[in-house]
Amino acid sequence: MSPEAPIASPPDCALSNPSVKDARRGHGLVRWVPETWFGHWFLGTNVWSRYAVEVALNDLARLMPDSARRPLRILDAGSGPGVSLPLLDRIFSPESILAIDINPKEVQRSGRQAGLCRCEVEVRAGDATELDLPDGSVDMVLCHQLLHHLVPQKEALAEFHRVLAPGGTLLLAESCDEFISSIPVRMLFRHPNETQRSATGYQRLVRDAGFILAPDCVETSTPFWSLPDWGLRQKLGWKRPAGAEPTEVAGAAMKPWE
């Protein structure tokens, strides 16, 4: 999710990173941070679509709990350029997908991807923290690389919990603070650094929102594209230190059955 951020009252934390000062409006703080031109460009690359989105969705499908509701109605929250839409259609065979993004330009890009889907797809502009959807109206929410762009993360998760039907699934994949705080990412992208979390922190956030996230439904990883050297040293035989923080976390959480 990207540009022209709406205004909000100051959240729980302050945005002190110089890279986001230009995202302030008036006396309030933005609810999310607009992406850089490089970030927009990167979302259109093969690295993003193949190694970030496709790999994540296949992993998330594998992590889904057996007791979860069948995902007939899917919400893709923060759909960006929409490369996830054909993948959601192929992997889960839903009846319908609703894709939302706060950036109208990304909505246009998602609309082009919607034409590649077999199921019914609606693409619209929307705010993940204020979803214009009835309670219990979707069976699955995809939240892929969205929360680390948001300041009101708890509000977004509360909305996902509200619109999910009992037994519905939240598919969450996030880049962790270990990656977001690295020098290359800080130079090329823009994020609200004060709200970044570790893999453990994201898992706690999801559970605190009322979701069930079983240990066997979550994984952490450090893919090559999340390393400063893009994995070159690993190809030469270097091994990451034991206990090093992962850069990515993926989990399939479930809203409890009532």
Q: What kind of region is each of these model predictions?
A:
Residues E4-A68, L87, L171-N193:
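Conserved class I S-adenosyl-L-methionine
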Residues L142:
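A conserved beta-strand element that flanks and buttresses the S-adenosyl-L-methionine
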Residues K154-P166:
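A short glycine-rich, Lys/Arg-flanked "PGG" loop and its adjoining helix->strand segment in the class I
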Residues P215-V249:
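Conserved catalytic loop of SAM-dependent methyltransferase domains
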Residues T195-G210:
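Short alpha-helix
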Residues L75, P81-T129:
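Class I SAM-dependent methyltransferase SAM/SAH-binding core
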Residues E130-D135:
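Short conserved loop adjoining the S-adenosyl-L-methionine
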